Amino acid sequence: MEKRLLDFEVGETVELFLLIKSSIKGTASNGKPFLSLVLQDKSGELEAKLWDVKESDEVNYGVQQIVHLIGDIQNYRGRKQLKIRQIRQATPLDGVNASEFMETAPINKEEMADEITQYIFEMKNANLQRITRALLKKYQDDFYDYPAAMRHHHEFVSGLSFHVVSMLRLAKAVSDLYPTVNRDLLYAGVILHDLGKVIELSGPVSTTYTLEGNLIGHISIVVEEVSKIADELSIDDEEVVVLKHVLLSHHGKGEWGSPKPPLVREAEILHQIDLMDASINMMDKVLKHTKPGEFSERVFGLDNRSFYNPTFE
């Protein structure tokens, strides 16, 4: 099987076609310009530096360009980085296209849509069900295409809906174990908690923050959407206030982006399973490329820790 970008070990030489996910110009200590690149294929992404760049390089090696490169995998502060030796733009004769390099969710969109719809049908509270169905219908095309984040966790095509499906499975397990949990409120919170990402982020390819994302953020965006849809549906019961609290507090702490801490049982559960699913996704991503008996590269989103891959099963 042909090796992909993250299959290469430190010290190995890479010769691959890759997609440029991001390209940022900087100035080195010697005053010469360089490009900080994030390069990706279906296995994931790595950072790279292109030194002593010319103006034409900024155009040739911009976002969404496919390139052919030769380089070396190095260790930089506990993480793999690619040192570029040769690079060129791909041409039509190379026969490659962007979709070949984009990581996607391990479940297809149709399966995820069917599963999420089933959870909505299980909801018995009419107000929560109507709000959830209406918002999902409004944004369903983007919801099933967008990543869950720019970096760190579920940052791939359909990552948002895959994150929600995983969390719904966790929510069901928690609700089955603890009968005091309001299953409908928890399900609604899970499905809607990151829906604002479809406005906060630019899309599934070369994702950046939109103006709304930079100035407002996905939490405030989705709470505003809930308020608007509740008005349209003439729902002004307590469910609206409590659902908005669950969404506002799902990051858990003010320093993590939530204006309120969780003050409802289901809000705390949502925060915990969101954190769990994101953390496991980040660990799985690095441990998949870590040999048994070795430590992974550092994971910035998990306090810059390295994780050990045990030798036993």
From Swiss-Prot:
Keyword Hydrolase tagged: yes
GO biological process, one term: rRNA 3'-end processing
This protein's UniProt keywords: Exonuclease, Hydrolase, Nuclease
PROSITE patterns assigned to the protein according to its UniProt record, in alphabetical order: HD
Listed GO MF terms: 3'-5'-RNA exonuclease activity
EC number of the protein: 3.1.-.-
Gene3D superfamilies: Hypothetical protein af1432, Nucleic acid-binding proteins
InterPro entries xref list: 3'-5'_exoribonuclease_YhaM (IPR020873), HD/PDEase_dom (IPR003607), HD_domain (IPR006674), NA-bd_OB-fold (IPR012340), YhaM_exoribonuc/phosphodiest (IPR050798)
Domain of life where this protein originates: Bacteria
Entry function: Shows a 3'-5' exoribonuclease activity.
Family: Belongs to the YhaM family.
UniProt protein name: 3'-5' exoribonuclease YhaM
Source species: Listeria welshimeri serovar 6b (strain ATCC 35897 / DSM 20650 / CCUG 15529 / CIP 8149 / NCTC 11857 / SLCC 5334 / V8)
